Amino acid sequence: MGPDNRRILLATVLSVGILILWQVIFPTKKVPPKPAPPPAAEVAKPAAPASPAPGAAAPAVPAPPPDAPEETVKLAGKGFEATLTTYGGALKSLRLEGDKFRKQEKDREVQIDLVHVTDGQPYPLSLSASPELGGAADVAADPGARAPMRIVAKDASSVTFEGRVGNLAARKTFRVTGKPYELALDVELSGGAGNGTVGVLYPAFMPPDTKSGGIFSGPPLDFVRPVCRAGTTTERFDLAKEGAPEKLEGQVSWAGVDQHYFVAAVLPAEPIGTCTFVRGPVKGAGLAALAVPVEGGARKLSLTVYAGPKDLDTLRGYGRGFESAIDYGAVAKFFALFARGLLYVMRWLEAIVRNWGVAIILLTVLVRLVLFPLTYKSMQSMNEMRKLQPEIEKLKAKFGDDREKMNLAVMQLYQKHKVNPLGGCLPMLLQMPVWFALYAALQTSVELYREPFLWMKDLTAHDPYFILPIAMGISSFVMQKLSPQPADNAQAKMMLYFFPGFFTVIMLFVPGGLTLYIFVNNLLSIVQQQLMMKHQQAAPAPAAGK
């Protein structure tokens, strides 16, 4: 195989790597099937107040609200404000505090709320008894989960509800613990008979037309999924799909809802019970149910509720595999360890310079320094190839259209002068794992969410004015221009124009932090190459030999 063909082969390999990166960044849009319209009789007929019989289908319309008027209580914790409701004695809203935890909603910015439910769904942390304990067979449509409870005690940091769950008396106390984004929940069940289970419910709703990822964007901030850690496996539940309930194997360490940079979950004191994902009662709705065994009609539970950002150190502090709430994706998960390493380095740099954009620039410099011995040898090889260009032109004139003989002669020329024609591609190959890892860090690390740099308001979002991608494309073109060109003119044009253009199009909608890294890396490569060319300019070109 000739040297030019080898360059094209390696370029093709790089293109495949870029295409893989494209698939990671821009996953295929999931288009859920259109829901079938409900029968006319069900639309006109009001919902019956009685619970559905065991084994009956889920109702197509939301259950009616409780008759008793709703009361709410607000608890202010460290970094959040929780609103608790008497409907189920549960969590109606949990808003994160601070300018960082805001999102754009239509024409205004609002605080991020980690509760996502729709009409007919229970609220997070409501309870549902199994049929053996007087509850409903379909937990997703159980009206008892929103049954009114009464407030029996409250102060600035706690509230206690009392009511019934199936045929059990229930007492639920929520307390602010003083830790960031944390509540404590104590549950006491009594007064029943027999054995069964009581589910601690964490529901979620996402409009069926929500994109899980499109051609030009990753998942939106409000892309939510019920999630559960059972045994040693963390599973996420796709609300866009239809199907029967899914029960996970193994005792449950935590269960809740995953929302991109955030997680809201309930953690028992120790692994217990089972976890089931259940769909309904409407399209796009579902829940994770932590089913806890109840024997003799009584049970006490001490639960921790965490609802906040996916800070790696914080999640690790809880143990129980809680750090697996950070989802690196199918491909990027192979770079998860590397991504965490990059994040720790960037956090250290940001603590010094107090700007995440500058920290990414300094990270680029550090990576270049680490890879300098390899990139130096690679650029030496490129410069040696450039010196041989006059001899290659002579070979092109000598052999004309006989490409096989020309490639053989060029390869012999490279061997004679100990030049590796593939050496120039080594720097990009070495950088690709860094790109994947940095992309994974940008997509999963809340530290970089809404962090500005220059004209960009958020380094985890794409450049709104496309300045960086275009600048990156120009710098890639300059790098190709400085590199030795293949002997074949068509191949030379493809290397010079196609790859920078193709790469620019891909980078238009990736996170600005990744584009910044690649742009700065290109600039450093250009400067290094220019300095080496000036340093070696005085050296005589190697003779072709006789």
UniProtKB/Swiss-Prot annotation:
Keyword hit for Metal-binding: no
GO cellular component terms given for this protein: plasma membrane
GO molecular function: membrane insertase activity
Entry's Gene Ontology BP terms: protein insertion into membrane; protein transport
CDD domains associated with the record: 5TM_YidC_Alb3 (cd20070), EcYidC-like_peri (cd19961)
Superkingdom assignment: Bacteria
Region feature Disordered, mapped onto this chain: 31-70
TM annotation in the entry: 8-28, 326-346, 356-376, 422-442, 459-479, 498-518
UniProt feature, compositional bias: Low complexity: 41-60
Subcellular locations according to the entry: Cell inner membrane
Membrane topology label: Multi-pass membrane protein
Keywords for the protein's UniProt record, in alphabetical order: Cell inner membrane, Cell membrane, Chaperone, Membrane, Protein transport, Transmembrane, Transmembrane helix, Transport
Gene3D superfamilies registered for this protein in UniProt: 2.70.98.90
Known partners and oligomeric status: Interacts with the Sec translocase complex via SecD. Specifically interacts with transmembrane segments of nascent integral membrane proteins during membrane integration.
HAMAP family: YidC_type1
Function: Required for the insertion and/or proper folding and/or complex formation of integral membrane proteins into the membrane. Involved in integration of membrane proteins that insert both dependently and independently of the Sec translocase complex, as well as at least some lipoproteins. Aids folding of multispanning membrane proteins.
Entry's family note: Belongs to the OXA1/ALB3/YidC family. Type 1 subfamily.
Entry protein name: Membrane protein insertase YidC
Source species: Anaeromyxobacter sp. (strain K)
